[in-house]
């Protein structure tokens, strides 16, 4: 079950907004009917996107995972 403030991982690419599978976000709102709003930020704290996603598009973080940094395309932000 996904709850507000959970850290989640994007399960598939969202090319229209420059997000890739594996990007990490924070749940900022859970919709009663299903789905949630997830905020994706740079490591510097800049919000890239707040996206409405279904739970199928997300997965919880796993205890044996490590974050990976990547450069974002400035034209998509």
Language-model features and meaning:
Residues 2-66:
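Basic/aromatic-rich interaction segments and small domains that mediate binding to polyanionic partners
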Residues 63-77:
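Long, low-complexity intrinsically disordered regions
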């Amino acid at each position: 079950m996904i709850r507000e403030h959970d850290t989640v991982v994007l399960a598939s690419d969202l090319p229209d907004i420059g997000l890739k599978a594996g990007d990490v976000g924070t749940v900022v709102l859970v919709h009663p009917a299903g789905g949630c709003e997830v905020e994706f930020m740079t490591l510097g704290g800049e919000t890239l996107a707040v996206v409405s996603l279904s739970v199928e598009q997300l997965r919880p973080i796993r205890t044996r995972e490590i974050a990976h940094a990547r450069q974002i395309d400035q034209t998509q932000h």
